[in-house]
Amino acid sequence: MSEIIESTVAFLIGLLKASWTRTAWHFAVLSFVYVIARSIYRVWFHPLSSYPGPKLAALTQLWYARHWMGGRYPFAIEEAHRRYGEVVRIAPNELSFNTAQSFNEIYGHTTKDHKPFIKGTFYEHYQPEPGIVAERNPEKHRETRKLLAHGFSARALKAQESIIAQYSDLFLAQVKKLAKSHFWIDTIHDAGILVTLFEIGRRLPLLWPLILFSLPNGIKKKFDLFLKYSRDLVRTRVARQNTLTREDFFARLLADKSHSQSEEWLLAQANVLVIAGSDTTATALTTLIYYLAAHQDKLWHLQQELRETFDEASDMTSEKLQGMLYLNAVIEEGLRICPPTAFGLPRISPGAMVDGRLIPKGTVVSTSSWTTAHREDYFHDARGFHPERWLPAGHALWNAKFQHDHLSASKPFSLGPRGCLGVNLAYMEMRITLAKLAWKFDWELVNADQLDWESELRFEGFWKLPVPRVRFYCIHV
């Protein structure tokens, strides 16, 4: 061993004494040898070497980065699974799955026989404090989730319903006008590219200078504006802590004195609530408006259910709408066909079984929600918009051709201890808004011939949706 150390020291001293040209040459040779040796290891000797996938993905992060930058990452993963099977190696130390079983095993609740798959480095970011979504520590996440959960309880959501109804009515009042989005919605969509750039920079550190140089000034300004907006919300809410009579999402966070909450920590939670509470619902509703406009028979069935049940839009409470079977089927189908989070959420294997395979400890794994929800062996005519697949067998519109669909393969809000905390709020928002819209308006797609929805979809951390031109006709004033 001492001989090896002495030889290494002598080699380094020799490099220092050599000319810069010779030193550069030596480093070039060493770098080349290192790359070749690493490539040989990754292709033939790495623990994941037996898993199929694109050759470039086994060697480097470039395959991953190329498809993220192109905005078609969910579709690239789907194509990889179509070509290579249910388990695909998508990076040197990363596997993608597309089965319903893997969903439960990677993201499901921890048991005595099921070790937790913690979140990967994808969630690391450059803000002082992580929000609940980015928190990788299971204990800290559990504490924060417990505090926030009170704001999403059935009792709390019942208290929030009047606010949701108020804003859905405001939306309906603006439908016939050419109204622009609020700036924070635009900001979230535009700044979604930051998620892509940060992820590529993390995987390919040598590209950081190029990424920072190419970052558009407009996006940075919008993101700073969004942070200022969230910070103002936090400061206003903290100042009103002792005067509010209704419990909101921050009530328990501020009331808990077991540990101090800095403004940065509160800001991180506010960012999550604003983004998750706006982009997800907006994406789902836009998708539903498009697909219903493109499938007038589905829109008609939805309107018949609502218009035959309710005399006034104000009668549409969340509790009553939960019983509208076709409405709920439409929403589930919209979430399946365009899931809000379309890529596999990365987790780190603790050295556990997934889909009957022992995945080495430290391997990054995920299940692609887009790919799983579009498998033809899980969903009959998976590319088609068919709310009927979600109806019970006794419903008049139930169709036997969907009876073997694997409905649990659609997980738009993930599942388990890290599943979406606001899922019930999201469903309430979608039910109330879509129900009132379909009760009050007819609508049709104006640019059907110029629009290819799926081919125009782009994913940059958030969906960038095509722009459907829809003409609305007011039926109930």
Swiss-Prot record:
Its main location: membrane. One of its GO terms (cellular component) is membrane. This is Cytochrome P450 monooxygenase poxC. It comes from Penicillium oxalicum (strain 114-2 / CGMCC 5302). Belongs to the cytochrome P450 family. Pathway: Secondary metabolite biosynthesis. Induction: Expression is positively regulated by the oxaleimides biosynthesis cluster-specific transcription factor poxB. Keywords: Heme, Iron, Membrane, Metal-binding, Monooxygenase, Oxidoreductase, Transmembrane, Transmembrane helix. It comes from the Eukaryota. Its EC number is 1.-.-.-. GO terms for molecular function: heme binding; iron ion binding; monooxygenase activity; oxidoreductase activity, acting on paired donors, with incorporation or reduction of molecular oxygen. Cytochrome P450 monooxygenase; part of the gene cluster that mediates the biosynthesis of oxaleimides, cytotoxic compounds containing an unusual disubstituted succinimide moiety. The first step of the pathway is provided by the HR-PKS poxF that serves in a new mode of collaborative biosynthesis with the PKS-NRPS poxE, by providing the olefin containing amino acid substrate via the synthesis of an ACP-bound dec-4-enoate. Pfam families: p450. It is found in: Membrane. Heme binds at residue 420. GO terms for biological process: mycotoxin biosynthetic process. InterPro entries: Cyt_P450, Cyt_P450_CS, Cyt_P450_E_grp-I, Cyt_P450_sf, Cytochrome_P450_monoxygenase. The chain crosses the membrane at residues 24-41. Its cofactor is heme. The keyword Ribosomal protein does not apply. Coiled coil: none annotated.
